[in-house]
UniProtKB/Swiss-Prot annotation:
Signal peptide, first to last residue: none
Name assigned to this protein: Kelch-like protein 30
Disulfide links within the chain: none
Sequence ranges assigned to domain BTB in this UniProt record: 33-100
Length: 589
């Protein structure tokens, strides 16, 4: 007998894969399979146990008191044999190829036969493929086939991109009922108040004979009362569909003159795009004998505001509850503002947080969201395809990325960027996530990386004329182009993804540190502080850039001397928030 030998725990890592692979091969041997699925005349030999593990439908069928539990053959009705074959192969291999041609069939069948893993990945695939050309069809599909998360994100995409969607073929194919529903949605985000009326006319002109009778009803929900008298008069004079319809003329006539009579305030709610800022640390005098009262005042100074680009005023929002932070990041999604990460320690002794907050615009309150998987400071965040991505800012030697699904309230890790960068910015543009940055080493050239959410894959883009080293870069998008600035130069760069080309635009008026850049309509808004003069005065200022005229315009100071802040944009009813923001005056050291 063998003595004095230690136990050995043996595990063959490839065993489970080998078993499944072997079962996939052996199932075609009639002696080694135990059931045959028959779909429209095609036969698929299988193992009951494998199907039951992957499908709740088959689990109930084979373990319940049904005839199918003992039958050698089971007929599956209302299922495409090609899709059935794909699902069976997935059950044995765990692999699945999803494309435009099979995704609808896979979702439909995985719902019917309860393959939750397949349904989930197909749902995400549809959400990541969404754009202006297909969001309406995806919305219809999600509604019809019991995918509420898909329908919700498609509707959100439509609301945020109505003007682009209204130019696509799917929009012109809408039924009158759907058209009326979409056009009357009070949450549509339109940058041009004429967009609803233009969309209604565009749709009717696709089939004048059949659709002209729908125009009065469509115009009745097109918020005509928010339009100028000049535009309404032009419609009456130059648009035959209106001038030749007594009902339309009457409808237009009722709204003429409201502008001069001051009745615009009684018009339906019109969502206006505004700039929002969340402030962190505020400039304070460096005095060692600062008393506790001053510290408490500093800690609770107002820190959340929006800028109305029409009135040129800063208005107050309810304070962000986590005062005096730095290193956090903000983005907006469905007109709610999300703040992630950051630190409240000093820059020499900082501690990052996993915290996330959401300002729910409709309720006017801040709510915590599910904490991130990793703590992050000095990271970037971006919204893309109805989800939020947070990039970098961890202590790892890799650019770790997480994705937040607001529908399920969950975070998930995605593939890290291919190349490590520590000095970076990120933005979503045309269905992709762009990461622009370099290592912290001085004069290290920038790298452009692109993430495709549909494939969960990153690529490094070799781009001609990419800018050299930039300190603390910051970017945003306007009209499908990416604009890039930094705090060490007044130069402004524009990247055109369609042609993979960089070019320079007009210089900034001043440098901006620890600020942000966002877009409102066709204009960029850049914020941030700078030191000036012999007295070392510190100013936090804003300037705007008109992308159509290539001109920068100074917009004055921010309402508080924040040493750190972030900006974004949302659409909102400005009549709801009318209190001017009371910040701190600019200070000097």
């Amino acid at each position: 007998m063998v003595r004095n030998i230690d136990d050995l725990e043996f595990c063959l890592p490839s065993h489970s894969d080998a078993i499944l692979s072997g079962l996939q091969t052996l199932r075609f041997n009639p002696r080694l399979s135990d059931v045959i699925l028959v779909v429209q005349g095609r036969e698929f030999p299988c193992h009951r146990a494998v199907l039951a593990l992957c499908s709740q439908y088959f689990h109930a069928m084979f373990t319940g008191d049904f005839q199918e539990s003992i039958s050698a053959q089971v007929e599956i009705k209302e299922v495409d044999p090609e899709v059935m074959e794909t699902l069976i192969d997935f059950s044995y291999t765990g692999r699945l190829t999803i494309n435009q041609g099979n995704v609808e069939g896979l979702i439909r069948t995985s719902n019917l036969l309860s393959f939750p893993a397949v349904r989930k990945v197909c749902s995400r695939y549809l959400q990541q493929q969404m754009d202006a050309t297909n969001c309406l069809g995806i919305w219809e599909f999600g509604e019809t086939h019991g995918c509420p998360e898909v329908a919700a994100k498609a509707l959100s995409f439509l609301q945020e991109n109505f003007e682009a969607v209204s130019q696509e073929e799917e929009f012109l194919l809408l039924s009158p009922e759907r058209m009326l529903c979409y056009l009357g949605d009070p949450l549509l985000q339109v940058r041009d108040e004429q967009s609803r009326a233009k969309a209604a006319l565009h749709w009717v002109k696709q089939d004048k004979e059949c659709r002209a009778q729908c125009l009065p009803q469509l115009l009745s929900v097109a918020q005509l009362s928010s339009l100028t008298d000049q535009y309404l008069q032009e419609l009456m004079e130059v648009e035959p569909l209106i001038s030749e319809s007594e009902v339309c003329r009457t409808l237009i006539g009722k709204n003429l003159g409201q502008e001069t009579r001051g009745l615009r305030e009684q018009s339906p709610v019109f969502l206006q795009e505004v700039l929002v800022v969340v402030g962190g640390k505020v400039l304070e005098e460096e005095e060692e004998d600062e008393d506790e009262e001053d510290e408490e005042t500093q800690r609770t100074s107002a820190n959340f505001a929006y800028y109305n680009t029409k009135t040129k005023k800063w208005m107050a929002f309810p304070d962000f509850p986590d005062y005096n932070k730095w290193g956090f990041s903000i983005t907006s999604l469905s007109n709610d503002v999300y703040v992630t990460g950051g630190s409240r320690g000093s820059r020499d002794d900082s501690w990052s947080t996993r915290q996330g907050w959401r300002f729910v615009l409709n309720e006017g309150i801040w709510k915590p969201i599910t904490p991130m998987i990793n703590p992050r400071t000095n990271h970037s965040s971006a919204s893309l395809n109805g989800e939020i991505y947070v990039i970098g800012g961890t202590l790892q030697e890799a650019v770790e990325v997480e994705c937040y699904d607001p529908y399920s309230g969950t975070w998930s890790l995605i593939s890290p960027a291919q190349k490590y960068v520590s000095n970076f910015t990120a933005v979503g543009c045309s269905g992709k996530l762009y990461l622009i940055g370099s290592c912290a080493m001085k004069y290290n050239a920038l790298t452009l990386q692109c993430y495709n959410p549909a494939t969960d894959g990153w690529s490094v883009i070799a781009s001609p004329f990419i800018p050299k080293y930039l300190s603390s870069p910051c970017c945003c998008t306007v009209g499908g182009s990416v604009y890039l600035i930094a705090d060490n130069t007044k130069k402004v760069y524009m990247y055109l993804p369609e042609v993979n080309l960089w070019k320079k635009v007009q210089l900034l008026h001043t440098l901006h540190e620890n600020g942000g850049m966002t877009s409102v309509g066709s204009c960029l808004y850049v914020t941030g502080g700078h030191w000036h003069g012999m007295a070392r005065d510190y100013s936090v200022v804003m300037e705007s850039y008109d992308c159509n005229t290539d001109v920068w315009t100074r917009q004055g100071p921010l309402p508080s001397p924040w040493l750190y802040h972030c900006t974004s944009t949302i659409f909102m009813d400005t009549s709801r928030w009318t209190e001017e923001f009371q910040g701190q005056p600019e200070a000097e050291l």
